[in-house]
Amino acid sequence: MRLTLILVTSIMTIVAGCAQPTPQTPPAPSPTSAAVPRAVQPDPQETHFGELVMLTDGGENAEAYFSFAGDRLVYQATKEGMGCDQIFTMKLDGTNQKMVSTGSGRTTCAYYYPGDDWIVYASTHLAGPDCPPVPDHSKGYVWPIYAAYDLFKVRPDGTDLQQLTDSPGYDAEATISPVGDRIVFTSMRDGDLDIYTMNLDGSDVRRLTDALGYDGGPFFSPDGAKIVYRANHPTDPQEIADYSALLADGLIRPSKLEIWIMNADGSDKRQITDLGAASFAPFFMPSGDRIIFSSNTGDPSGREFDLYTIGIDGEGLERITYSPEFDGFPMFAPDGTTFVFCSNRSNSTPGDTNVFLTRWID
């Protein structure tokens, strides 16, 4: 789900097979965008970061995830002239940015396959070429759950597009186990927003969660044995009624999300944060015994999102970033030290979200 852009804007807004569209060339950088990456110094309190390298500058760029070889990133972006997100790849120096999605509809949540010969992502393009409508914010701060989202895989050059899911309702938020055997994703195929796994070809779908409420944003642990995710399970009758009414309209209210973990087969579910805030984008640290995630827990206004780490036992919460705006979508490369995240810091245009690379310092 495309969280960053909705956060930033709000904070300060049946086919048997797929014909292969011709990949489009992304728009050229605007004159105000940096043509090459640039160094940015972290805040003095950000002691886990070496020098930051800003890989993008201009538009909205987020959810950047490493290839299995650790030499490329796949990410989603709304660049100049685009109405909504498409999927791009780039080298770790920010060069060779190429669009790999169709250029139609809205896309989200891309991830490399083992061997880096495929990329999985969600797209609405089968429902039409236009961007789907943004949420009606008269209902408050809400996220859209686009029923037109299905999962696809594509070659890194944008060819050989293949559909993986074809169920009624939302299928998105897919990532792949480091072991290379299963895709984990969020789906509404059974009437609620739950987490499922499947084989890399879309077969053998298994449901992992069944509690009322939203379960999503899943990632595997380094050994593939566990899954970390974000969740909101309403229990109060009014909260349940509100959740059900919004979901019927294709919306959810994400003001309170906690971080959970479970075994890769769905057993032993445990809540590991209790912050009463919007906590999301969890990712396992290389050791496998801590989680890094984004949350607005440190800001009474709920507008500033920073990165935090916490033990899988729920102990040892540590704040990592101190930017006054948005920091989110953290991920470690396979080498365990190269680190990527997305932020509003140091941008050329206020509110833009960009991709940053750094070396993690323990």
Protein language model features and the residues they cover:
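Residue-level detector of Asp-centered blade-edge/turn motifs that repeat once per structural unit
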Residues: F68-A69, P114-G115, P178-V179, P222-D223, ...
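Hydrophobic beta-strand positions that form the internal "hydrophobic ladder"
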Residues: L73-V74, I119, I183, I227, ...
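C-terminal motif of bacterial Sec signal peptides marking the signal peptidase cleavage site
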Residues: V15-G17
